């Protein structure tokens, strides 16, 4: 069953039923102000950091679900006094509408609805040049009689720190402050004290009434689905003093038949320097707020801001596009996959409908992978993020696992000592320099972090190349009894905790003190070392003559790669597939000898990507085992058989019910590793088959089962051992987005970067006979035509050397 459809021409997903299986959301924001917006108007906004600068309040785990956001109420008063009340976005009133349509576009959403011959068209977006949301509401009278209407707005303010806001009520119920000035409601909580920021909600009409106190607006023992002010058609003109600050405007409107009225609301954020917080008379400095409101007060100004937003996304998506005879493939590559990559890069894993914005910031591992999906669109932002993330690396080569975006200070709030972390930096930096030719990054001054998360102040000057060397040496030189890298707290699979041994339900697997076994080893990290070691060696050789920052590192890396490849084949080959690990007692994990968890996807995928054991056809055998034991119609399970009881020697992975999350779920993030491995092996039909099993556009028809948005990837789909196979959770913020874009754009379609130019090396399904790719590379537009007349999977790779120029470079490649 579907709940909408793709409008590829407008780059929108159109939802025609408000009761989607879960809230289907969109993201707004291109700079520092960001918003989450559901198909019924739910969600919230924040400035830079969803934990520390939350602007509007949102209640996770609420009943009904998704029941706070930016809401509007229409009160329709008939001549006989009868009234009907409805919400243009369906929620919060949930009155049955005569029509409803939500369109999620690139950085904006619209909701069109009607009730009793009144049509409401609402536009929501964050402009590229302002720290605010714009809400434009147009009401039209389609009846033959005059309509007397009341339009109410409603948002609820968060008291900035989202965690404190939901826990510290003994204080917070006393500190809320607001000010109302000419229809603009200012939220000033703590501005008199330590804060230099405030928010506001304005309307470009003189309001008929307002409220800033939630209790006054809603009434006693009621909710936002039945506010007392809406029922009575009044406003309390209330001023919040503590309790629950909110912002509601009321506008009384008369519409003749055929007449329309448009109202513009701005929900904004302002920071003032300390010396400019107050005017000379001691009043709030509203200069910046009034300038923002003035810049967005007319239809023409809003239209211009929307045009700027459209141009922004048009530019981003112009850097890579494909044209084939498969419209689902084209829409994934050209629109939705790249859009999700940008959102995931921006949010990391901090703020979604599954991540509360409280527990996680910008992850070291996460962001290095996310950059793989956006660096062709955003090289400058990629460069800065690489510097930021390298700055939370520790001097020994390990790293803090995350940092908060507002402070950029490393922290162990969700654990540390994940020994895969350092190697992702090598992959991301190498990919960035291949993309841009910016070898100067290697000499960029980047400090290491001290144990407090702040930049180390030991007087030593370090550069980016030092971080890459430390990362590689740290992993290569910390090995276990079988010569494989030590796993630490965990590797990419956070829940494979081989040194944890936790029996206390009140402990976190991610933060509990681990046993320093010195024996638990990761085959995944070993394969990553081979893969990233080749990247480091290539980078070292390519940088010769440009910088001495990596002098001698290529030789070290290649020696380590050759040694580790041999060790994997000798000590981690199980006969039909690669082991996953050795535990703290040197027992095999992911072996045919194990009754449960006998095969894992990660080591098969990454060993295949790195072509470990290819001379012995180990990669092909491992991939065949994936197909036999892990693959099914909804994707590839992370492991099989699923664990049925808790095993404290393996940790959190065994605490999940069978078939969910890391215990046998389809962890979509590593499905593309297998897709790439199949492409490396030249098996294009199988690579594309796996791609289609989890790509949202290809599974839209099972939206009632899948539940999450049919236009973006989810982190997890319930696996074959679960009670609900095919049901997804945790959409939007997942490394799945970047890795699937890498898999399809670089390995199936086969357009990859090198230090010398572009490599054209497609591995196609046999029924894809012709395609055209436009790829911007170092400022040059490449127009690449790929012909596959005989329906083959793969041909010989071709290098197109880079040459600067202003004219498009046209290339024709034929698979022979």
Predicted regions: what they are:
Residues 636-663, 764-788:
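Generic long, charged, amphipathic alpha-helical segments
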